[in-house]
Amino acid sequence: MTYLLVDGENVDATLGLSVLGHRPSPEQRPRWERVRSFVAEWGVPVKALFFLNASRGELPASFVQALMAMEFRPIPLSGDAQEKVVDIGIQRTLDAVAERPGNVVLLSHDADFVPQLKALLTDGRRVAVVGFPEFVSTRIKALTSDGLEIIDVETQVGAFNAPLPRVRIIPIDDFDPAPYL
């Protein structure tokens, strides 16, 4: 089993604030079915969980239905305004996954999950963080020496319909000047 956990708030905020510079339109958001398909290529069944902040008492019904149609299990969490309910929910889920066999893929850039990720890396399972590597927390990046994989949601997963306006470090061996001319 591979557990796919999506920090919906974090992915949306990083895409909007750091990559696009504005709130993403539906066409600019990741194609979640591609993310799930990418993870399924690991060759084991996927349990896909999508964490949502529902603290305002609202649930985006059409989005929830779309997630369910793509075989994601929406997990709408609520709490006090100052509580990071999505982070708490993901932390608890990662702790629970540590008690059972299975790989883990987390879509987030957030350092709040470092203790749980570190614990998961100690028993030989495959663990990855998917996102925009240039925005992944340096504390998460430090776990690559323990075996954590960092996977680019755009270039490796192919989760977007059009190229994003990203500025990132390009290894010289990968540099092609044509797109810049």
Q: Across the structure, where does each feature detected by a protein language model lie?
A:
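Domain-level signal for Mg2+-assisted phosphodiester chemistry and nucleotide/NA-binding surfaces
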Residues: 1-84, 126
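Nuclease catalytic cores that cleave nucleic-acid phosphodiester bonds
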Residues: 56-181
